[in-house]
Amino acid sequence: MAKDLFGTDGIRGVAGQYPLDRDTVYAFGVALGKDAALHAAKPEILIGADTRESGTWIAELVAGGLASQGAQVRYAGVITTPGVAYLTRTGSFVAGVMISASHNPYDDNGLKVFGHSGFKLPDDEELLIEQEIFRLREAPVAPQPLSLTVEEPLVRQYLKYLSGISSVRLDGVRVAIDCGNGASYRLAPELFQGLGADVVTICCEPNGRNINLNCGALHLEALQQAVVAHRAHFGVAFDGDADRAIFVSSSGQVVNGDAVLLACGRALKAAGKLAGNTVVSTVMSNLGLERAFDAAGIRMVRTPVGDKYVLEEMVRLGAALGGEQSGHVIFREYSTTGDGMLTALRLFEIAQQAGTGLDELTADLKIYPQRLVNVRVREKKGLLELPAVAKEIRRVEDAFGGAGRVLVRFSGTEPLARVMVEGPNLEQVESFSTSIADVIRREMGE
C-alpha cells in the first residue's frame, strides 16, 4: 500500500495547514507514541528542531501526543538532523523526531523520524504510523500541547562527538561558513573555532523566518563573495537542518556533492577503508563522476534520489561511503545519515593531508553538462504512463545514442515533476530538457 503522508524525507507541508495542521501533528505524536510503546514499557523520545518559527508549537504538539501514550519526551531544542540521529542511536531513546523542512522556505516544516538505531524508519513502519494517524483523525480529540524545556547538554554531547572524530587541526586556516540561518548557526562556528580555524560567518542570525532565505546550500553567491573577499581557504554552506553541505574553494568555485564523493572515495580507497571499493550515489550524480571513479578502480552504484535510499543500499552492500550531488554525504563508520559538519571535517582533513586546496583535489573531474527543470503539476500520478511524455523521452534517448542520460521523476516532497537531462553538449542538453518539460507541462501542469 502506498503512503500518503510520508514522502522520501518524512512528512512535509506548510506549517498550520494539512498535514501539518494542529490536529494532524498531535495525531502524529499519539501514533508515534503507540508505536514506541510496542518497543519499550516507558519509551523515551527525543525531539529536535531547526530555526523555523513554527518549530516550537509543532514540537509541543508532538510532545503532547507522545505524553498521552506514556512516553517520556526530551527536547534538544535547535539542533541539526544528524544531531538527532546521533543522539537517538547512542542514547536510551526508542525514537527521535526532527522538526524541519530542510532546504524549504520558513513557512514549510516537516516531521522526520529516526528509530533507536539512528536510521530513518522503514517504509512499512511509516505506513503503520500513517494509518493510525488517519484513524485518529476520524474521531479527533482536542490537542493537548506539552510545554518543553531545552536540554542543552544533549547538544553539547553531539558537538563533543564531532570534535573527537577527526585529528584535523585548522590553526592558521580561514573558513567561511554560511549556516543558512538554520540549525547549524551556533554549532558550526563553535566546532571549527574549537579546531583552531579563523571563522568568517554569514547568515548565522536566525529570526524564525529567514532560514534558507537567499543563503545556505542552495544559494551560494554570498558565500562565494565572502570566500574571495576574506581570502578564505575553504567555504562551506549548510542547508536548514545541516544534513548536507556544499563547498566553495579558495578561488570561489563551487564544489558540490559529486566532487566531495570523488575526493572522499579516493582518499578512503588509498587508506584501505573503502569497503568493496564501492561508493553509493544516486541517479542524479553526473556521468563524469562515474567515469572518474572507473578510472580510480572504484565502482559507483546508483539509487533513487534520497539519502534514505542511499543509506539502505550502503547497508545492503556494506559500503563505507555514499551520498548525493546535492551535498548529502554519509560516512557509515560515523553516522546513519548525511551530516554537513562531519562532511566538512572529513573534506578539510583530506585536503590538509594532500597539501592542496579544494580546487586541486578534484581537478580531473570532468562534469558533463546537466540541466534540471522543475515543472509544477496538478497531481503526482502516472507521469511516465502518459503516451506523449514517454514518446518525447524515447526521442531524446534515441538522439543521445547512449552518450547521455534522461531522468524524469516526481519530487518526493513537493508537487513537482523533475526533468534531468545530461550529455556531452550543453546546447543539446538545454534543448532536450526544455522539450520534455514542455510536454509534461502541457499534459499535467497546473
Curated annotation (Swiss-Prot):
User: Which terms does the UniProt entry file under GO BP?
Assistant: carbohydrate metabolic process; peptidoglycan biosynthetic process; UDP-N-acetylglucosamine biosynthetic process
Show the GO cellular component annotation of the record: cytosol
Gene3D superfamilies the UniProt entry points to: Alpha-D-Glucose-1,6-Bisphosphate, subunit A, domain 3 (3.40.120.10), Alpha-D-phosphohexomutase, C-terminal domain (3.30.310.50)
State its Enzyme Commission number(s).
Answer: 5.4.2.10
Q: Does the keyword Cell membrane apply?
A: no
Q: Which InterPro entries match?
A: A-D-PHexomutase_a/b/a-I, A-D-PHexomutase_a/b/a-I/II/III, A-D-PHexomutase_a/b/a-II, A-D-PHexomutase_a/b/a-III, A-D-PHexomutase_C, A-D-PHexomutase_C_sf, A-D-PHexomutase_CS, Alpha-D-phosphohexomutase_SF
This protein's source sits in the domain of life called Bacteria
Sites bearing Phosphoserine, chain numbering: S102
Q: What does this gene product do? A: Catalyzes the conversion of glucosamine-6-phosphate to glucosamine-1-phosphate.
State the CDD domains in the record.
GlmM
Name the coenzymes or cofactors required.
Answer: Mg(2+)
Whose protein is this, by species? Solibacter usitatus (strain Ellin6076)
The name this protein carries in UniProt is: Phosphoglucosamine mutase
Q: Where along the chain is Mg(2+) bound?
A: S102, D239, D241, D243
Keyword Metal-binding among record annotations = yes
HAMAP family xref list: GlmM_B (MF_01554_B)
Catalytic residues as annotated in Swiss-Prot or TrEMBL: S102
The record's top EC class is: isomerase
Please write the reaction equations for the catalytic activity of this protein.
alpha-D-glucosamine 1-phosphate = D-glucosamine 6-phosphate
Name of encoding gene: glmM
Q: Which NCBIfam families match?
A: glmM
Indicate the family of this protein. Belongs to the phosphohexose mutase family.
What would be one Pfam family of this protein? PGM_PMM_III
Co-factor binding comment? Binds 1 Mg(2+) ion per subunit.
Q: Which GO terms describe its molecular function?
A: magnesium ion binding; phosphoglucosamine mutase activity; phosphomannomutase activity
Q: Which UniProt keywords apply?
A: Isomerase, Magnesium, Metal-binding, Phosphoprotein
